[in-house]
Curated annotation (Swiss-Prot):
Name of this chain's protein: Protocadherin gamma-A4
UniProt function note: Potential calcium-dependent cell-adhesion protein. May be involved in the establishment and maintenance of specific neuronal connections in the brain.
GO CC terms: plasma membrane
Species, as recorded: Homo sapiens
GO molecular function, one term: calcium ion binding
Designated gene of the protein: PCDHGA4
Location (main, coarse): membrane
Keywords in alphabetical order: Calcium, Cell adhesion, Cell membrane, Glycoprotein, Membrane, Repeat, Signal, Transmembrane, Transmembrane helix
Ranges annotated as spanning the membrane: 724-744
Region span, Disordered: 1-24, 832-871, 932-962
Biased segments, Basic residues type: 952-962
Ranges annotated as biased composition (Polar residues): 836-871
Length: 962
């Protein structure tokens, strides 16, 4: 068994900063302290018994000491060495500190085997002011399951200065306190112990107080303040002292507190006036309440001892009625009116006293000065309260008299009025004055005058009296109503509801009453044959303009009005203002299709396209206009429906129908297109047109395809019944046979004409062709009123607008009376000598260039062996045949043929249509393929040969327009 003993010497050994233990550890026995030199037996026995007890108590216990506030990791002691173990054996034997669930102040270094601090240790926090501060910890040896108790003593360091509970202490001391009086001072506190604790106090040097420190039975020191000599508050009211507390550490630490000695006043001083006598002069007319002067007495005491109050001494009734003394401020004010004639001098005794009753006296001498104390008086004897604005200058407004009770210069009075008024003062006799108008008055500038008449004497200072005269200016009707602007503009959308408010017109009249009461009216006039009152009306009282009808922008776009504003004066005055009423366009008109036109029988026109056409080939062009204006009239074209999707495309802005790809043999002869034209209004309006395109490469192909032409597959026809299909097929077969016979006759006639031409005979001219419809319905050829550019480059071009020119419909009564079913021509020889019947030379301006000719995009030569017809006769015959055949094959009726006014063919191959019911838009059209206008075309119809009409007819790819 091992025993560890502490020395018996009461003076414990000092622990070093290295944390060396303050004991020796022995193995196998108990070390006992050496006895004294000559101990007696009793003392020796007591020591042995005590050591035996200590051996049992202190067995397996180690004591260390360490200073507080050391850094973390500071060495406290070497556990391994004290246990007789090597540092590596600590881990092998499982040596560790047993935790008790609280913060550990120490830790075991496993490498060195030393006990170190786990953090900063504050002794004052652990043990407060206890003289001994010891903390215990237990070390477990796991291999032997033994507990080793370790005690660590925390040694105090001087880390806290003395401090006072308050930084400043106020002590009140009476200024008459006797020397030797004691006053307790605040105590300081130092949490350190021993020599590091509070050791004493110091007081800064001063001539009135000293410091005496008393020690109590518990050893605590109590500082006291001792008065050394008499005090005087008036000399020094506050004394500032500094009390310092210090400890005995090294270095010495200290704390301070400010001591404020406030002297309490005693009434040891009487009030004293600043002057033994006060002199003052005052004018007799000084107003009541005027401060005359202020008497002042001072008292150096404080509080009630220094509060001075004032009063009159031996006051007489006369003085108490004329003067008043403020007891607190010492102000003497005028209580009653002073009169120099009554008394010119006053002698007043004034007394000052403090709270306890000490007094002082002084005199106030008042001299009264004579003054101009009477103001002039103004008496109005005659007055006019109103005057008309048309009154002439010099009109009398008032008559008054002035008077002043003073004498001498104080009684001389002069009168005046402001300079900016249209009035003047005229002195008559004595002290009488007249108030007159200086110029003509204008009520619209100033309707009421407040005239101030000032009467002033010549005293020092001068006194004056003001008299106010009120004058009303009566109105006359001298101003007509006026509008803020010389003219007005108003805007109203078309299709407005009846009774809609358009504009509110307001006129101003600076007059008053009936002269300013305004009525509004419109000047009588007519517009488009109707009075203006049928279009608009105006409220005579409010000036609000109303619409009596719904306006139409397409009928008129503006309306000029003249508005009159009249007052109710006598005579009445008036003024006029012009109003321009503009009608704003609304999108209320759908686009109108100009080409192709809609025949009266409901059929659609036929456009021709050769099968050899490449992609981008111009088939036709849709022309439309919109009656609206601006954005509402901007049109765009699009393809709504097509019997062969992807075959055709429509120009968005031009309306040109072009092939989107090259035509193939499998493409049907008849192609049906639905083109929609839409404007850009809000909401947009649109119109649709149905086009029928016949696809063929040559005349034989056309004739061959006509027999096998089938109606295009249309989802809308899926509902036709079987009997309708059979009927249409039967009619088509009969009609095809008729057309075949008719075509043979026409070919024979054509061959005959070619033989005559070959023999060199000069043709007298071919008259205008006359046609009668197949079923007795006339097919009238009508000259274009609107043409579209259909050149090869028209995809990039736009519409060109020409001057309007109507062409009459050409009708031949003779052709109607002939028995020939289709065509009767006059004898060519009979017309040879008639110059009026001679055919005009072909106009080269109407011809297509070689690149524009039909067929394979103008690649064919212009010889007589060409595929397409080379004269007007053949072309007209081909058109009639295609018209009849395509109509019967497609619809079972004359839907493909031309109704009244059209032959149903494209503009490229000479379509004609009537625009009798369409507005005149001819200024928007030019003749395709030509620089000529419609006027030139009209001249051509009259038989006049145009310039350049001697071109080669064989090279023309287009027949001459009729």
């Amino acid at each position: 068994m091992h025993f560890i003993l502490d020395p018996e010497d009461p003076g414990a050994p000092q622990a070093s900063t290295e944390g060396k233990p303050k004991h020796r550890r022995l193995r196998g026995g108990v070390v006992m302290a050496a006895p004294p030199a000559r101990p007696d037996h009793t003392r020796l026995l007591q020591i042995c018994l005590l050591l035996g007890v200590l051996v049992e108590i202190r067995a397996e216990q180690i004591l260390y000491s360490v200073f507080e506030e050391q850094e973390e990791g500071s060495v406290v002691g070497n556990i391994a060495k004290d246990l007789g173990l090597a540092p590596r054996e600590l881990a092998e034997r499982g040596v560790r500190i047993v935790s008790r669930g609280r913060t550990q102040l120490f830790a075991l270094n496993p490498r060195s085997g030393t006990l170190v601090t786990a953090g900063r240790i504050d002794r004052e926090e652990l043990c407060d002011r206890s003289p001994n501060c010891v903390t215990n910890l237990e070390i477990l040896l796991e291999d032997t399951v033994k507990i080793l108790r370790v005690e660590v003593e925390i040694i105090d360091v001087n880390d806290n200065p003395p401090s006072f509970g308050t930084e400043q202490r106020e002590i009140k001391v009476a200024e008459n306190e006797n020397p030797g009086a004691r006053f307790p001072l605040p105590e300081a506190f130092d949490p350190d112990v021993g020599v590091n604790s509070l050791q004493g106090y110091q007081l800064n040097s001063n001539g009135y107080f000293s410091l005496d420190v008393q020690s109590g039975a518990d050893g605590i020191k109590y500082p006291e303040l001792v008065l050394e000599r008499a005090l005087d508050r008036e000399e020094e009211a506050v004394h500032h002292l500094v009390l310092t507390a210090f400890d005995g550490g090294d270095p010495v630490r200290s704390g301070t507190a400010r001591i404020l000695i406030i002297l309490v006043d005693t009434n040891d001083n009487a009030p004293v006036f600043t002057q033994p006598e006060y002199h003052v002069s005052v004018r007799e007319n000084v107003p009541v309440g005027t401060r005359l002067l202020t008497v002042k007495a001072t008292d150096p005491d404080e509080g009630a001892n220094g509060d001075v109050t004032y009063s009159f001494r031996k006051v007489r009734d006369k003085i108490s009625q004329l003067f008043q003394l403020n007891s607190l401020s010492g102000d003497i004010t005028i209580l009653g009116g002073l009169d120099y004639e009554d008394s010119g001098f006053y002698d007043i005794d004034v007394e000052a006293h403090d709270g306890p009753g000490l007094r002082a006296r002084s005199k106030v001498l008042v001299t009264v000065l004579d003054e101009n104390d009477n103001a002039p008086e103004v008496t109005v004897t005659s007055l006019t309260s109103s005057v008309q604005e048309s009154s002439s200058p010099g009109t009398v407004i008032a008559l008054f008299n002035v008077h002043d009770s003073d004498s001498g210069g104080n009684g001389l009075v002069t009168c005046s009025i402001p300079d900016n008024l249209p009035f003047t003062l005229e002195k008559t006799y004595g002290n009488y004055y007249r108030l007159l108008t200086h110029r003509t008055l204008d009520r619209e500038e100033v309707s009421e005058y407040n005239i101030t008449v000032t009467a002033t004497d010549q005293g020092t200072p001068p006194l004056s009296t003001e008299t106010h005269i009120s004058l009303q200016v009566m109105d006359i009707n001298d101003n007509p109503p006026t509008f803020p602007h010389a003219s007005y503009s108003a805007y109203i959308p078309e299709n407005n509801p009846r009774g809609a408010s358009i504009l509110s017109m307001t006129a101003q009249d600076p007059d008053s009453g009936d002269n300013a009461r305004i009525t509004y009216s419109l000047a009588e006039d007519t517009f488009q044959g109707a009075p203006l009152s049928s279009y608009v009306s105006i409220n005579s009282n409010t000036g609000i303009l109303y619409a009596l009808c719904s306006f139409d922008y397409e009928q008129f776009r503006d309306l000029q009005l003249l508005m009159t504003a009249s007052d109710s004066g006598d005579p009445p005055l008036s003024s006029n203002v012009s109003l321009s009423l503009f009608v704003l366009d609304q999108n209320d008109n759908v686009p109108e299709i100009l080409y192709p036109t809609f025949p009266t029988d409901g059929s659609t026109g036929v456009e021709l396209a050769p099968r050899s056409a490449d992609s981008g080939y111009l088939v036709t062009k849709v022309v439309a206009v919109d009656r609206d204006s601006g954005q509402n009239a901007w049109l765009s074209y699009s393809l709504l429906k097509s019997s062969e999707p992807g075959l055709f495309a429509v120009g968005l802005h031009t309306g040109e129908v072009r092939t989107a790809r090259a035509l193939l043999d499998r493409d049907a002869l008849k192609q049906r297109l639905v083109v929609v034209v839409q404007d850009h209004g809000q909401p947009p309006l649109s119109a649709t047109v149905t086009l029928t395109v016949a696809v063929a490469d040559s005349i034989p192909d056309v004739l061959a395809d006509l027999g096998s032409l089938k109606p295009s597959a249309d989802p809308d026809d899926s509902g036709l019944t079987l009997y309708l299909v059979v009927a249409v097929a039967a009619v088509s077969c009969v009609f095809l046979a008729f057309v075949t016979v008719l075509l043979a006759l026409k070919l024979r006639r054509w061959h005959k004409s070619r033989l005559l031409h070959a023999e060199g005979s000069r043709l007298a001219g071919v008259p205008a062709s006359h046609f009668v419809g197949v079923d007795g319905v006339r097919a009238f050829l009508q000259t274009y009123s609107h043409e579209v550019s259909l050149t090869a480059d028209s995809r990039k071009s736009h519409l060109i607008f020409s001057q309007p020119s109507y062409a009459d419909t050409l009708i031949s009564r003779e052709s109607c009376e002939k028995s020939e079913p289709l065509l009767i021509t006059q004898d060519l020889l009979e017309t040879k000598g008639d110059p009026n019947l001679q055919q005009a030379p072909p106009n080269t301006d109407w011809r297509f260039s070689q690149a524009q000719r039909p067929g394979t995009s103008g690649s064919q030569n212009g010889d007589d062996t060409g595929t397409w017809p080379n004269n007007q006769f053949d072309t007209e015959m081909l058109q009639a045949m295609i018209l009849a055949s395509a109509s019967e094959a497609a619809d079972g009726s004359s839907t493909l043929g031309g109704g009244a006014g059209t032959m149903g063919l494209s503009a490229r191959y000479g379509p004609q249509f009537t625009l009798q019911h369409v507005p005149d838009y001819r200024q928007n059209v030019y003749i395709p393929g030509s620089n000529a206008t419609l006027t030139n075309a009209a001249g051509k119809r009259d038989g006049k040969a145009p310039a350049g009409g001697n071109g080669n007819k064989k090279k023309s790819g287009k027949k001459e327009k009729k």
